[in-house]
Amino acid sequence: MSNHEEEIEELAQRIGKIEVGDTKSDIYQKVLNLIDIERYEHALKIIEKYLGETDAVYERAYCAFQLGKEDFSLEDKQFLQHLQAQKAYRLSDFSKALKIYEHLENDLPEQRADIRVNMLAAASQLPGLQLNNAVSLDDQDSVFNLATRYLTIGDWNQAIELLSSSLEKLENSDSNSEDHKSQINLCRLQLFFAYLQAGDNEKASKESLKISKDCLDETSQAIFVNNLISMSIDNPYISFRDLHGTNLEKALSSLLASQKKQFIRNLALLDMAVGKQRSVRKEKKRNPEESIYFSTILLREETKSLISPKKLPGYLENLFKSDSDNIVVALLLMQHKISNGNFRGALSIYQKLRTSLEASQSLSVLYSPGLVGLGDALHYKIQSTGFKSQLLHEAANYWRKQQSCEAKLLLCTRSLLAHLDERAPVSTIQDDMSVIDDLLQWKGPISELVSCKVAALCYLDKEIESGMDKYLVPTKDLITGIDVDDIEIRGVPVSAAIGPIKRSVEANSSNSSKKTRKRRKPTPKSFNPKATPDPQRWIPKRDRTNVKIKSKGKSMQGGVA
């Protein structure tokens, strides 16, 4: 147990200690204090032991929910839905959180304003989702969430403009409360991040100097230091000291799942920069879902000890033989063979890795988009004629049975397009379209899904649904700045052509550019096929009777005639 955890435990024992003479209100206040420091188990024990069934009902349900226990005795089901939405948001399942908030908006019209703020917070993390309701720019929380949405879709200028105007309003306010100061610094922190993403390090540095760390909570402090490190890491030891000077354990427990994943990766890179390989190995055991990432940075450090780079292939071969399901080693070995043009060798490594992953039931890794794409590319290199994306379709069949995720989005869309190219049966296309519809409900009408659905509808000779055209880029925008007449005259460039079209273009261009040369005759010009052959042609010239030998004169070579 770390020092911080020991301090929290001591604090929990102190503030949660029930003394003689404590009233129900005193005990209730101690329960609230325990919930504030996230000691839900201790708080729930006090509620069950010292308070009645009708006391602290919501606190009881909240603690039970945080501990993974469902409290069905609570009649207020909307309160539980609020908790489920918060949990989904913390786990970065923003689509699920948004659906729950939509139900709550219909069931609780009196709380519609607050619920819409939460809905905007969840929608801001979904880049393909269209915002149906207009956002009020008078509400600071709504403006902050809208700016976060612009950051998600990469519109840095809009985010900077919104955050700057919001910051100006907050600074002109007369309030001097701690919450107000915290809100100003939080807005500055987001503006600092927006400048970083836009590549304006000068303004980002100026904004960082205005942030008061004392007014930020522990999680925001860790994020602030992490952003400072990403702006400049001249001395990794100072960066390591500054980051570990914050309460990392508290920050990691409060971050969203997607933020926590990136934060753990940054910490591992910083540990490697200061030579703390042992701590990285410990983190690898704590986070098995990130084992591939940790193995990569550890292996990169291990290979530095090799005397010569020529020993690297043998080193990787030995590692792969000892651990055939080590994905990092297998990928490095395949990369080395591909760079040398040995595609069959790379494919054999891939097949061995596939066998190992199937034996260990690591199907989520086996059917990950990167590995599937690599396997398909290797098969295509070796068998280009009559190639079908069998690996891609296998992976898509696996992911379509799983919950909606990025891997399902990537592979199922590509599988549908591959089926269209392969002229698959109508039933197969319809099955693929049902998965696309599920993904549209999860991710929203993003361009990949809309284009796939439109392509499938055209293949099935069906009308495109009304309303989908607004998510497609108009043709006039696609051809802006392009001379269509010139392209029609010149033809399709080889670099832009795909598959059989490219091969036919190359064949036509090669035939037209070649000059026809006359074939040289196998006989000399003076050759007469009707002439009688010389019977002495096989005898040396000096021995022939029909050849006059040149006589040698007494005069010197080059003399006067």
From Swiss-Prot:
SUPFAM superfamilies: TPR-like (SSF48452). Residues 505-561 are annotated as: Disordered. Pfam families: SRP72. Residues 514-523 have a biased composition (Basic residues). GO terms for biological process: SRP-dependent cotranslational protein targeting to membrane. GO terms for cellular component: cytosol; endoplasmic reticulum membrane; nucleolus; nucleus; signal recognition particle, endoplasmic reticulum targeting. It is found in: Cytoplasm; Endoplasmic reticulum membrane; Nucleus, Nucleolus. One of its GO terms (molecular function) is 7S RNA binding. Keywords: Cytoplasm, Endoplasmic reticulum, Membrane, Nucleus, Ribonucleoprotein, Signal recognition particle. Its main location: cytoplasm. Belongs to the SRP72 family. Component of a fungal signal recognition particle (SRP) complex that consists of a 7SL RNA molecule (scR1) and at least six protein subunits: srp72, srp68, srp54, sec65, srp21 and srp14. Component of the signal recognition particle (SRP) complex, a ribonucleoprotein complex that mediates the cotranslational targeting of secretory and membrane proteins to the endoplasmic reticulum (ER). The SRP complex interacts with the signal sequence in nascent secretory and membrane proteins and directs them to the membrane of the ER. The SRP complex targets the ribosome-nascent chain complex to the SRP receptor (SR), which is anchored in the ER, where SR compaction and GTPase rearrangement drive cotranslational protein translocation into the ER. This is Signal recognition particle subunit srp72. It comes from Schizosaccharomyces pombe (strain 972 / ATCC 24843) (Fission yeast).
